[in-house]
Structures are given as C-alpha cells and as structure tokens.
Amino acid sequence: MSKEPIIKLDNIDVTFHQKKREINAVKDVTIHINQGDIYGIVGYSGAGKSTLVRVINLLQEPSAGKITIDNQVIYDNKVTLTSTQLREQRREIGMIFQHFNLMSQLTAEQNVAFALKHSGLSKEAKAAKVAKLLELVGLSDRAQNYPSQLSGGQKQRVAIARALANDPKILISDESTSALDPKTTKQILALLQDLNKKLGLTIVLITHEMQIVKDIANRVAVMQNGKLIEEGSVLDIFSHPRESLTQDFIKIATGIDEAMLKIEQQEVVKNLPVGSKLVQLKYAGHSTDEPLLNQIYKEFEVTANILYGNIEILDGIPVGEMVVILSGDEEKLRQACQAITDSQVQLTLLKEGGKA
C-alpha cells in the first residue's frame, strides 16, 4: 500500500453563524489519508465528522485551513480552483449516504447512467460502462428493476455503482449502512472492501459504530465536539485506546462490557478466594493464548480458569482479549503475572481474591 497521502486536511476549521451565535463544528483538525486506505472517522451525532468530510470536495467550505487532494491544493484559506476546475476535481470523489437518493422513476441501470450524463461517452460506451458497474456491485440481474422493486441493500449497491461511474479515486461513505440490517451491512462492507482491493479505491467511512471500522478499516480517527481526539491504525487504537470515548466505542464493538456484566454475577467471581486474581488479558499478534497459559502453569503452577475469550482479526492481525481467574501461591502468582506482562500481553487486575 502506498504511503503517499491522497487526502491532506490541515488545520481545518468550520464555523457556522446562526443568528447571534457561532457554532464551531470542526476545530483545528488535521488528517492525512493515504492512497488505498480504508479510513474510518468515528463519533457520535454532532461530533463534526460529516461536516469534516464534506470539506474534502468543498461541498462544505471551511472557515480556515488547507486542503490538498491528490497533490493538488484546492483550498488554502480560500478556494484555489476555478468553478470548472472544482467540477473536475469533484469527479474524482464519489459519495454514498444513508439515504440512497435514487430516482424512483428510473431503473437501476438508468440511475447509474444518469451519473454519466456529462461524461462525453457515446450511447454504446455508456451502456457498456453501466453494465460493467452493475456487474461490479453484483446487480447485473437487477438492471431493469425500479428502486421500489429493490431491497435496501440492493438500492445501496445501485448508489455505489452510480458513485463509481466517473472512475473516482476516492469514495466517501457517510453512514451508508445505518439504515440496513446487520446481515446486509456486512454484505455492503464486504463489497466496499472488495472495491478497495480491485480498484485501489481510497475509502473514507463516516460512522458512529466502531464495529464497522473494526470490520474493514485499516486506520481510524475519533472525533468529539468538533475535535480530533485520537487517530492511528485500527490495530493500535483497539490495542491501546487512550481516550475514554475511544475506550467506550471499543467496549461496545467487542462486547466486553456485556460479557463483564455476566462474569461479575458468577459465584466463582463473587466469592473469589484468597490466592486468586481476576484479570483481563489483551494481546495483538499472538496466534493463540494457550501456550502462554500452559507456560505459566508449568513454570509457576498457576492455573487459569478462562471465563471469556474473544479474537478479532484487525487489518490481518489477530487481536485477542480474555478474562481469566489465575490461582496459585501468592509469590508464584506475582511471578506469573510479571511473566505475562513481559510477553507483551497487557494485564489488567480486575479483582483480587479475598477482597470486595
């Protein structure tokens, strides 16, 4: 994957003026997105994430900052392109939304063809391109269907085909799966991931769900109240989240919070005996946790009772999380915990035996 940024947003501010007050929707945000990235921007409603991505193609003009797209500066405290140049630049960037915005009176192929209206292609070339795009998104057999005859997932596939009609280098997905059921969401995310690989497409995902980022992104930014509060590779953010909001997003995405509620109700945890510790283990890159637990038993005679375990594959790397009860002699238990930490596994003490 190329390390050359295709999108550079530097010190972006967006301020709205409403009556006698100012709303600072985006505050001094800098984000660089590399060619070929699937880059997630996560935040709750009102975080400023949708406003931020709309500055990428100047659908929203910032109040200050610099925007560079594919090595071309398009904004430097003012728009640097003519209206014609800006139209050409916007052809390089496709967008899909939560609402599909299809024209109900047009068939699937006609909706896609509409995006080629000013392409200069012949009628035959347009038809061939539309057919290719519908095949790309898995809808060749639905070309003659109207939107009312399509499911939500199929409508979004038409919207994706339309967004790709002018061969953009960048695709912005603004909450594009929010209106879809979980199964269809996974299918659309798999399609986006496939397009990223086949076309070398750079994808910017706007979402309030860390689960979506976890499934397909390689980098993520977290926004809160217009500010960028955390940014990095998905692996780093999931392994070592710094900010409390990021930690909350990750707990929801991994299901650990729900698991902990059940674990805390177990009798063995409520009445944890002296000589036992309830610990949470997190690791990245280890193919399995079993050798480590076997090792501490062999070396320190410390047993491990696994109460919860989960492994995710993030950007091709396994990331694991476990909740276990470690039991043994006090000194051996201390040594075992140190050995676990020394093996690059993050250990968090949740409860100590004999204590409330």
Curated annotation (Swiss-Prot):
Subcellular location: Cell membrane
Keyword Transmembrane helix: no
Physiological role: Part of the ABC transporter complex MetNIQ involved in methionine import. Responsible for energy coupling to the transport system.
Keywords: Amino-acid transport, ATP-binding, Cell membrane, Membrane, Nucleotide-binding, Translocase, Transport
Gene: metN
Any one of the GO CC terms: plasma membrane
Residue intervals of the ABC transporter domain: 7-250
Keyword presence, Coiled coil: no
Similarity field: Belongs to the ABC transporter superfamily. Methionine importer (TC 3.A.1.24) family.
Catalytic reaction list: L-methionine(out) + ATP + H2O = L-methionine(in) + ADP + phosphate + H(+); D-methionine(out) + ATP + H2O = D-methionine(in) + ADP + phosphate + H(+)
GO molecular function: ABC-type D-methionine transporter activity; ATP binding; ATP hydrolysis activity
Binding annotation for ATP: G43, Y44, S45, G46, A47, G48, K49, S50
Mode of membrane association: Peripheral membrane protein
Top-level enzyme category: translocase
The name this protein goes by in its record: Methionine import ATP-binding protein MetN
EC numbers, comma separated: 7.4.2.11
Description of how the protein assembles with itself and partners: The complex is composed of two ATP-binding proteins (MetN), two transmembrane proteins (MetI) and a solute-binding protein (MetQ).
